[in-house]
Amino acid sequence: MPRSPSKSSPKKGSPRKASPKRGGKGAKRAGKGGRRRTVVK
C-alpha cells in the first residue's frame, strides 16, 4: 500500500481493485490498478 499513496486515499477503490484483480478484465476497467496488474501478469 505504501507504493501507491494516491490509491490509499480512496478506500472505496480498494475493494474494487480486489474484484478486478481476479477477473483480469475488471482490472482494465479500473485503469489505474489495471495498468500495473497487466504489467505484473
From Swiss-Prot:
Location of the motif SPKK motif 3: 14-17
Positions of region (Disordered): 1-41
Subcellular location: Nucleus; Chromosome
Residues with Phosphoserine modification: 14, 19
GO molecular function annotations of the record: DNA binding
Compositionally biased region (Basic residues): 9-41
UniProt short sequence motif SPKK motif 4, positions renumbered to this chain: 19-22
Transmembrane feature ranges: none
Function: Core component of nucleosome. Nucleosomes wrap and compact DNA into chromatin, limiting DNA accessibility to the cellular machineries which require DNA as a template. Histones thereby play a central role in transcription regulation, DNA repair, DNA replication and chromosomal stability. DNA accessibility is regulated via a complex set of post-translational modifications of histones, also called histone code, and nucleosome remodeling.
Protein name: Histone H2B.3, sperm
Organism the protein comes from: Echinus esculentus (Sea urchin)
